[in-house]
Amino acid sequence: MQVLPPGSTGGPSRLFILRPVATTLLMAAILLAGIIGYRFLPVAALPEVDYPTIQVVTLYPGASPDVMTSAVTAPLERQFGQMSGLKQMSSQSSGGASVVTLQFQLTLPLDVAEQEVQAAINAATNLLPSDLPNPPIYSKVNPADPPIMTLAVTSNAMPMTQVEDMVETRVAQKISQVSGVGLVTLAGGQRPAVRVKLNAQAIAALGLTSETVRTAITGANVNSAKGSLDGPERAVTLSANDQMQSADEYRKLIIAYQNGAPVRLGDVATVEQGAENSWLGAWANQAPAIVMNVQRQPGANIIATADSIRQMLPQLTESLPKSVKVTVLSDRTTNIRASVRDTQFELMLAIALVVMIIYLFLRNIPATIIPGVAVPLSLIGTFAVMVFLDFSINNLTLMALTIATGFVVDDAIVVIENISRYIEKGEKPLAAALKGAGEIGFTIISLTFSLIAVLIPLLFMGDIVGRLFREFAVTLAVAILISAVVSLTLTPMMCARMLSQQSLRKQNRFSRACERMFDRVIASYGRGLAKVLNHPWLTLSVAFATLLLSVMLWIVIPKGFFPVQDNGIIQGTLQAPQSSSYASMAQRQRQVAERILQDPAVQSLTTFVGVDGANPTLNSARLQINLKPLDARDDRVQQVISRLQTAVATIPGVALYLQPTQDLTIDTQVSRTQYQFTLQATTLDALSHWVPKLQNALQSLPQLSEVSSDWQDRGLAAWVNVDRDSASRLGISMADVDNALYNAFGQRLISTIYTQANQYRVVLEHNTASTPGLAALETIRLTSRDGGTVPLSAIARIEQRFAPLSINHLDQFPVTTFSFNVPEGYSLGDAVQAILDTEKTLALPADITTQFQGSTLAFQAALGSTVWLIVAAVVAMYIVLGVLYESFIHPITILSTLPTAGVGALLALIIAGSELDIIAIIGIILLIGIVKKNAIMMIDFALAAEREQGMSPRDAIFQACLLRFRPILMTTLAALLGALPLMLSTGVGAELRRPLGIAMVGGLLVSQVLTLFTTPVIYLLFDRLSLYVKSRFPRHKEEA
């Protein structure tokens, strides 16, 4: 047993140094817990930060946007507006469809929100039209969130109606049952139905009306209870042939008698098996298809949900005929997995680089092994805590662990370097470990808690940005905390067992060359430091200039919100003139699809035309462009978008808007471009006055591109102006007029066919092939009081007007959304400021309000809190350091190093052409924690030298700088190399990781050079200031 010198207590490390078995087993337990925890951690793109969002869709075929707004949307909005926890309510009412999107506060559980929505729908039921084909349907899904998976179902042998029927009953329902799936939509609208197309001339010749036909059909097809007979011996259930199942049966239906002869439906109408809505269509790579979009519930794990769907797909497709093919066109998890794999590789690369730099400085394998064990142990142990906190393996937590490699190795390096110094002086390894660990223990604690203090403000950030970075901050803090524990336990214990004078002195040619190089560097630094200390005011001027430069760079640097990712999927909107029909839009999408599929980067394409819950108007079409994997194409997504828009620009009468899908979805509406700005008024008339003015002003701004709005008030409308007196004289009510028009032109769902597996509709309409356009109104006939028929033209005048194609509300008031992108050379911050300046110039009245939406609104909130976030980080660190040092002065000396980090980070971002977004801001905040480590190591040793050796402040700080130069250089290079893989990232998701790496590498490079000289000067300045205060106020001295 070694005899320990007096004072070799080892501090908190003593017990662990003297009990190596217990220490080893404790570390093994941490390692095992981390390995087990890793197996249970889910994989995701980003932390779960989704707002609880519910979409309510109501379909009312044939209803105009005005009718949908007043009769459907408004009653629902009034009930929804009374729900607690509602953050925002938006609605879109178009021809035949009402979509209300409800976004709740982050703190409200989705299941609670669902209960409130269901109760509100129930309360509004009595206020809704009595002839709604279906009640409002709600889905726990954000409509702006892109599908996690898109499947195309095609067949070259079966009609699309049969294909959709099979997909709906055999595939879609099963996928809907998967945990995490919020909504499965079948785009294409080929739901089977019996279509009855009335011949207006035929029914008029027979003195019949469409209402007569409708009544006959609804009365002939019923499916209701008929009772049972209960006799003395047996019970008998009653049934009847009260249903008609096929078009042939309906064709033979007798609807009236003329002169004793039956008039069958087939005599006055074309009856056929068709689709429920003939104005819906979807195509996959230009082939007619049923496109199945699978959307997840807010908060659901996308990887687990997609894996479950993939597992069941083979079994589901086996139940389909061989002529029906199911193709997975897009799977967002493919890019998510690739991004996570790339980040994991960068993590391993960072570990390798850090270990390499350690060996370069220590030039000793045993000494390199010790931190080589500490780094993975600290990182793996973090996984155990992540499991208990319900975190996931995602880009941000992996980025935190990658950055942590440079942090966690710092503590081990400081301990090893200090213990090695004593061993080289001749101390026994055990005594050196006890003495070195005891001496450095306070420094480790200071480094750890001051660094964690920097992360504390991130935990208190509000709203979605705070939720986004909570996992990042906590993961990093846990890794740093475990690192401190390892450095005070395992590291000194291993030093006592693995290091010796012989091993440290054993050198080869490489070691001797490195040693000579380091000696020369330290000597050069010493000479430079001596000169700096002799000219303190020049150094202070440099420090002050650095502070001013930081402020200037902060003001001028382009600012953004979140990096635009290349996930390999592009969402698009095709816009045509407002009066465009379904047939013309189908033709236009074919032309556009042909151009898009010619691009070498495009792998597949789906297009959709028609009005449903996802597409508001007939003059717009939805596109989803799936790109080839990143390693199989030459261009990034923004270059592909520019190329596609150029290719389509020559097609007359269309405008194509494209934007890449993102993992972070804040919006609640599918937008044409990345950013949104709303104009809201109390009336539609006020909007119609100000929308053109604001749109023209925004389109003239160079900071904005592709400016458009969803305001469409030039749709063609036929106004039926009924002479109520004439109608009343003939016994015709307005209800009769509405019914006649609805029967003829509304694709009216008049009856339901029930089967064992599904329900199908009977659709009534006029056959307008021979009388297209407004001429079809001349064929409408109404039944008068005496039983005769009267043409509509006898009581009404037809006027052609303009009407809105859709009416949008935000929190129950009319609103228009302006969509825009930011052109190259400008930032989102530039665009936001330009819009605000334009708004002031227009001098909008008080009843007109504006607001940014989605990511632009989040950008404003994040930008407003950024400065306070950095101030909070500095204040938190000052408090921690003040408590640790029991001093008001020394924390200021340490914090004086921070402007150097800001200058380096901001300069690096500007040189790299990167914006100051929230990822880069997190990097700057982390730099605050890293850079101050240099000052802590210098000041700790300087104070100890003054206290224990009686040195003057100048001699103490000079010696401390030289003694700590090597560990400072080593720890800084370790942190720099830990961030270097992120800066040089090129794989999937690199856009997300690169700003963090750029900010940290730039900040470390500049701060490393400056703080080595500015810190000792500022230390001496504050020392003189302290002496001056004590001399002026002797009471302070006495109390001290």
Curated annotation (Swiss-Prot):
- Report the subcellular localization: Cell inner membrane
This entry carries the following GO cellular component terms, namely: plasma membrane
Membrane topology classification? Multi-pass membrane protein
Question: What SUPFAM superfamilies does the database record attribute to this sequence?
Answer: Multidrug efflux transporter AcrB pore domain, PN1, PN2, PC1 and PC2 subdomains, Multidrug efflux transporter AcrB TolC docking domain, DN and DC subdomains, Multidrug efflux transporter AcrB transmembrane domain
Which chain regions cross the lipid bilayer? 25-45, 347-367, 369-389, 396-416, 440-460, 472-492, 537-557, 863-883, 888-908, 910-930, 968-988, 998-1018
Question: Tell me, what is one Gene Ontology molecular-function annotation carried by this entry?
Answer: xenobiotic transmembrane transporter activity
The family database entries (InterPro entries) matched by this protein are listed as: AcrB_DN_DC_subdom (IPR027463), Acrflvin-R (IPR001036), Multidrug-R_MdtB (IPR022831)
- What keywords are annotated for this sequence in UniProt? Cell inner membrane, Cell membrane, Membrane, Transmembrane, Transmembrane helix, Transport
Highest taxon listed in the record's lineage: Bacteria
Q: Name one Pfam family in it.
A: ACR_tran
Which Cys-Cys disulphide bridges does the record give?
none
Regarding protein family, the annotation reads: Belongs to the resistance-nodulation-cell division (RND) (TC 2.A.6) family. MdtB subfamily.
What assembly does the database describe for this protein?
Part of a tripartite efflux system composed of MdtA, MdtB and MdtC. MdtB forms a heteromultimer with MdtC.
Descriptive protein name: Multidrug resistance protein MdtB
Read off the lineage from the record: Bacteria, Pseudomonadati, Pseudomonadota, Gammaproteobacteria, Enterobacterales
